[in-house]
């Protein structure tokens, strides 16, 4: 029947040139194309003015004409923690040269910086900006080793052609620096990533310079909660990746914390804590409330002891003192496997630790828990407060600080009491951080005076009522 119908209409069928051309074109593709999917182009609905295209990135693909909208770029170079550029338009990223091209439709869009370009802290007429996308801006000890990324405002003729299109935004940042230090992993990478990407609900791709593969394995649960896509090793990337939106650099507000007034959706550290609870399936959102619990149930106290310096020399005495005031106590060196460490910490109501990266585990404590930081000798009080004193309060937890005396420091076994190490640490601070780190963080252990420390334990117990 189908053949008969064709035959009936055959006299007029080939009188239409457009139809004839279509049939010939299809036959040509079937006969001569090795694989039709090599030329696949998928169009999806996008934001008005920014057509969304996902193109097969094979090298046999022939570049299609690209609509170039007016570029929008906002860079902030005045923040004291990090430089960040956010852009929208036709964006092309070439990893092997660490370049991000924001394409303008004409020279007129570029001259004078362009109407959609807003860069604070730099020349308003600039068309090229250099960023080290790591959140320790100004630190001479680490920033020279951070890969520099260049953002360029160019015309289409100056930009490399696209090899691969993406329908989600990109975030470009460095995984170098202090990567591997537990505190810096959260402070320099994870929390800034949360601030910069969480509002995108996983629809974002991370383009990472100095990518440490093991790091993404260690924090897999967190990374997969922030992006649905495999993070890209940008330094090894040979293709030109194209996006409609991109951010170069990460937003960072303060040490181990978030300023909700500056964060998308007013995200706070409470939101970050709940994010961690979700990613690690932590059961306890709130610490014990002793007045509401069975009176036979004791609050649990975790004493974190360090493997190297700044250890508790008299750990047994500290545990006995805490048990004496009413805590159920455990002393531990936490598992390096993050899910196991997170689960363990979440089961406690209070934590005691000497200033150091172990205190970073406070992010896994339930809300209303108590954090006790023991501050070693050497005028470390300000640093201790910034790094581990403010964050607990921002996470709806309680914070207590115990500053040790010279008698409680093992430095008294190394230096005479009349030494400047005890009498005047300030010149040592002014001389160099390396010297401070060597003496006060690298040579010192702690022998707590448990009688002097007992009121702090009682205060912690009171805060849990």
Curated annotation (Swiss-Prot):
Disulfide bonds: none annotated. The chain crosses the membrane at residues 12-32. Residues 1-11 are cytoplasmic. Widely expressed. It is a single-pass type II membrane protein. Residues 33-465 are lumenal. Keywords: Cell wall biogenesis/degradation, Glycoprotein, Glycosyltransferase, Golgi apparatus, Membrane, Signal-anchor, Transferase, Transmembrane, Transmembrane helix. Signal peptide: none annotated. Glycosyltransferase involved in the xylosylation of xylan, the major hemicellulose (non-cellulosic component) of primary and secondary walls of angiosperms. Possesses beta-1,2-xylosyltransferase activity, transferring xylose from UDP-xylose to the xylan backbone. Catalyzes the addition of 2-O-xylosyl side chains to the xylan backbone. This is Beta-1,2-xylosyltransferase XYXT1. It comes from Oryza sativa subsp. japonica.
């Amino acid at each position: 029947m189908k053949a008969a119908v064709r035959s009936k209409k055959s006299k007029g069928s080939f009188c239409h040139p457009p139809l004839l051309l279509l049939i010939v074109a299809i036959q040509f593709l079937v006969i001569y194309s090795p694989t039709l999917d090599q030329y696949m182009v998928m169009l999806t609905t996008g934001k008005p003015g920014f057509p969304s295209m996902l193109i097969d990135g094979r090298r046999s693909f022939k570049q299609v004409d690209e609509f170039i909208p007016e570029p929008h770029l906002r860079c902030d170079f005045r923040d004291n923690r990090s430089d960040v550029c956010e852009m929208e338009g036709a964006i092309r990223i070439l990893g092997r040269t660490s370049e991000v091209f924001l394409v303008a439709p004409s020279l007129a869009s570029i001259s004078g910086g362009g109407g959609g370009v807003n860069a604070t802290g730099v020349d308003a007429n600039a068309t090229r900006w250099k960023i080290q996308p790591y959140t320790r801006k100004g630190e001479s000890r680490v920033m020279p080793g951070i890969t520099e990324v260049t953002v360029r405002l160019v015309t289409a003729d100056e930009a490399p052609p696209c090899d691969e299109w993406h329908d989600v935004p990109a975030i470009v940042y460095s995984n170098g620096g202090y990567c591997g230090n537990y505190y810096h992993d959260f402070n320099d990478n994870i929390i800034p990533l949360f601030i910069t990407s969480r509002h995108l609900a996983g629809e974002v791709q991370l383009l990472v310079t100095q990518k440490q593969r093991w790091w993404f394995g260690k924090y897999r649960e967190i990374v997969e909660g922030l992006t649905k896509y495999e993070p890209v090793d940008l330094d090894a990337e040979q293709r030109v990746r194209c996006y409609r939106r991109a951010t170069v650099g990460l937003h960072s507000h303060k040490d181990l914390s978030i300023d909700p007034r500056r964060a998308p959706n007013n995200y706070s550290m409470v939101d970050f804590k709940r994010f961690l609870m979700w990613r690690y399936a932590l059961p306890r959102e709130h610490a014990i409330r002793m007045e509401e619990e069975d009176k036979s149930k004791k609050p649990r106290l975790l004493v974190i002891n360090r493997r190297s310096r700044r250890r508790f020399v008299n750990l047994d005495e500290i545990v006995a003192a805490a048990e004496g005031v009413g805590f159920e106590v455990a002393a531990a060196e936490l598992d390096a496997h993050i899910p196991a460490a997170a689960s363990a910490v979440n089961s406690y109501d209070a934590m005691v630790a000497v200033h150091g990266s172990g205190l970073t585990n406070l992010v896994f404590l339930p809300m209303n828990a108590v954090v006790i930081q023991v501050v070693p000798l050497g005028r470390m009080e300000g640093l201790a407060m910034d790094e581990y004193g403010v964050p607990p309060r921002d996470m709806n937890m309680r914070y207590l600080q115990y500053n040790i005396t010279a008698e409680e420091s093992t430095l008294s076994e190394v230096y005479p009491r009349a030494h400047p190490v005890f009498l005047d640490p300030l010149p040592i601070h002014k001389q160099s951080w390396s010297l401070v780190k060597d003496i006060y963080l690298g040579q010192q252990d702690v022998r707590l005076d448990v009688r002097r420390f007992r009121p702090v334990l009682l205060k912690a117990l009171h805060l849990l009522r």
